[in-house]
Regions:
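Hydrophobic core
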Residues: 15-21
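Carboxylate/His-rich catalytic cores and anion/metal-binding grooves
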Residues: 205-228
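N-terminal low-complexity, Pro/Thr/Ser-rich intrinsically disordered segments
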Residues: 35-61
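Bacterial N-terminal signal peptides that target proteins for export
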Residues: 2-12
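Short coil/linker segments at helix-helix boundaries
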Residues: 189-213, 252-268
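Selected transmembrane alpha-helices and immediately adjacent juxtamembrane segments
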Residues: 276-283
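Aromatic (Trp/Tyr) and acidic
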Residues: 16, 66-143, 151-152, 167-181, ...
Length: 468
């Protein structure tokens, strides 16, 4: 059940105060997901004309049965959405190969959409755990796209996503520095919060596949860095913002990588420090949140007072009303450091993220699909960023509602959305419905930032599966 708004706000205030009193260093998690989901679609009717109309646009026609097109985990909840002006009582799950009905059940009507004049219902077929390829059909409505049920769906998705990072990396250039740094930040955060998900894939002290790929990205950054100044350069022109990103990411990687190779980690830390000192000498304006991120990472990695002082000075001027990307990373780093922190500053900044997470949760209560926004109103990047915030805060406060929302985001991205589009595609495996190259380039599996964000979602889901 979703928390009532009034009770949530009281609970949030108590929680934030407890985090301040504890020094902002504690994080942990345990969840079991619940069913939540609705759908909102419009049925398009074709009208016959007595005279041919040559100037027209073909309307988009969307399926009335929505499923997770990338597939369901065998032991997880399995939900489909059904919409229509008139709905049948039952649904049937059909084996795609044999055409045998393997499961039947009653649909549950959730609401009536006044705009589309359609009922919205869901079918819960969680009891079906046998691996295979299926589709869902209903009388008078039709059938869904095919979907699979597998024991290792999430494991497969994680492997494919990490492998796709390697393919994407081949086409990177120095123009991509900021996006590369953002991706590395998300991936390392995922490892910091949900490392057990990746470590279980590692044998004989080899690097986790995720860290191995992140190292390759970091190596590319080091090759782009000017060895003399420590800055990112475009010819003779310094790239100040890119240099600030470099400072933060190299220090962050150094902190994580020291347990695998202390010598390489130290080299990254020295490169980060060199970039920071270069920026200190420049009379230029750089976003405070970005400098704050770099300072928090260098402080956590070195413990030096100069970085502690910079964190306090920069943090004091940060907005308490916005959730900015670099500020978010810096806040989570500062909250997790084992070194001395300014408890008041830490609590105030962490409160910004907690408040944003609660805003997303409240918006999700009004959304038919149980997430904080819609692909019709926001970009895929914005949807994934909201999910990244929820994934992080679920680790901080262990909230059953947040875990449910992340499941909803995962389903939404894979086809349980207004347009039935699967936004997850992998190189050489593009098989679904987005044809425009501009749109395809942003898909998970083809875009490194969005792929990193989706990996974060998967790591949160898989961590809870380990606990069950």
């Amino acid at each position: 059940m979703l928390l009532k708004k009034k009770k949530r706000n009281i609970w949030l205030a108590i929680l934030t105060m407890s985090l301040v009193l504890e020094g902002c260093g504690a994080m942990g998690g345990n969840v079991k997901s619940q069913i939540q989901g609705k759908s909102n679609q419009t049925e398009v009717l074709a009208l016959l004309e007595t005279e041919p109309i040559l100037d027209y646009e073909v309307p988009n026609v969307f399926p009335s049965i929505l499923v997770n097109r990338i597939g369901y985990e065998a032991g997880a909840e399995k939900i489909a959405f059904i919409t229509g002006e008139k709905l049948p009582v039952q649904y049937h799950i059909v084996n795609s190969k044999t055409r045998d009905i393997v499961l039947s059940g009653n649909i549950v009507i959730s609401e009536f959409n006044e705009k589309t004049k359609e009922y919205i219902a869901y079918a819960d077929f969680s009891t079906l755990t046998e691996e295979g390829t299926y589709f869902l059909e209903c009388d008078k409505i039709g059938r869904s796209y095919d979907f699979t049920i597998q024991e290792d769906t999430h494991e497969m998705l994680m492997t494919e996503c990490i492998n796709s990072l390697k393919d994407i990396r081949k086409n990177l250039s120095k123009e991509d520095v900021k996006e590369v740094c953002s991706s590395i930040s998300i991936l390392l955060l995922s490892y910091e919060l949900y490392g057990a998900v990746y470590d279980r894939q590692t044998q004989d002290n080899y690097l986790p596949k995720l860290i191995e790929e992140v190292k390759a990205y970091v190596q590319q950054l080091l090759e782009w860095q000017d060895t003399e100044t420590g800055a990112m350069m475009n010819g003779e022109t310094p790239l100040y913002e890119e240099t600030a990103w470099l400072t933060a990411v190299l220090a962050k990687f150094s902190y994580t990588y020291q347990k695998f190779d202390s010598a390489y980690a130290n080299a990254c830390l020295q490169a980060s420090d060199k970039a920071w000192k270069y920026l200190e000498k420049q009379d230029v304006e750089i976003e405070s949140g970005l400098l704050f991120y770099g300072a928090t990472e260098l402080y956590r990695a070195t413990g030096k007072y100069m970085y502690y002082a910079s964190v306090k000075e920069l943090g004091a001027g940060l907005s308490l009303n916005l959730v900015e990307e670099a500020q978010t990373f810096g806040t989570l780093t500062y909250a997790s450091t084992k070194r001395k922190v300014d408890v008041d500053l830490c609590g105030r900044l962490l409160g910004v993220l907690l408040n944003r997470a609660e805003q997303i949760a409240e918006q999700a209560q009004e959304n038919s699909f149980g997430i904080g926004c819609s692909i019709k109103e926001e970009s895929l990047e914005e949807i994934l960023w909201d999910a990244m915030i929820i994934s992080s805060m679920d680790y901080v406060i262990t909230n059953n509602e947040y875990a449910t929302m992340i499941q909803n985001y995962q389903n939404y991205i894979a086809g349980l959305n207004e347009t039935a589009v699967n936004f997850i595609q992998f190189p050489n495996k593009i098989q679904f419905d987005i044809d425009e190259k501009e749109e395809m380039s942003n898909l998970i599996g083809l875009d490194y930032v969005n792929t990193a964000s989706y990996i974060m979602i998967l790591s949160e889901i898989m961590s809870h599966e380990q606990e069950e």
